[in-house]
């Protein structure tokens, strides 16, 4: 095996504990129509590690990075992952993994999660997480072109994008409110 073929087959892993600029831009809550097909997978384990793992698929309209080390996200309150995270966060043990494909790399981000208070009557369960550890993985011989993706139905596309923008605004307000209450810190 030659040196060049070894390099092509080698797994390149880039560890990070802050969002790289390309991911900050992905999770900045702007230009949601252009991020329509993006999907991230949130994997949540039961706090006692005895129950099944739960997975939620999240769009760019449900993810917001208020700073370089945090991620706010919204789930439907009836989702099992939301209920598990809420219970674990109340015990101080909320943990999840966010996985996704972006620009040819597979990302896996380990998160410490806390519940995020939102205005009364909000339709979503909101959370704030800090990056515990993360990495991006690529190989030289193959480029990931997509992970799980979706396409909005044309007759509902604008309504969904408008809803995403409202969700991001709720997350922004909740993060700002928490940050003020904590004296400027957004992370759990």
Segments predicted by a language model, with ranges:
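Binding-site signature for planar aromatic cofactors or substrates
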Residues: 1-188
């Amino acid at each position: 095996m030659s040196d060049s073929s070894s390099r092509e087959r080698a797994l390149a892993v880039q560890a990070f504990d802050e969002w790289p600029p390309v991911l900050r831009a992905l999770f900045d809550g702007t230009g949601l129509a252009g991020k329509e097909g993006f999907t991230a997978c949130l994997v949540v384990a039961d706090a006692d590690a005895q129950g099944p793992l739960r997975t939620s698929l999240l769009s760019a309209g449900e993810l917001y990075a208020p700073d370089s080390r945090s991620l706010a996200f919204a789930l439907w309150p009836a989702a099992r992952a939301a209920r598990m995270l809420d219970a674990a966060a109340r015990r101080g043990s909320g943990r999840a993994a966010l996985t996704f494909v972006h620009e040819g790399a597979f990302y896996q981000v380990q998160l410490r999660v806390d519940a995020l208070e939102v205005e009364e009557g909000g339709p979503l369960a909101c959370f704030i997480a800090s990056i515990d550890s993360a990495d991006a993985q690529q190989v030289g011989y193959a480029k990931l072109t997509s992970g799980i993706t979706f396409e909005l139905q044309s007759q509902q596309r604008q309504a969904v994008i408008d809803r995403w923008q409202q969700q991001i605004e709720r997350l922004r307000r909740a993060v700002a409110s928490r940050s003020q209450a904590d004296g400027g810190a957004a992370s759990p």
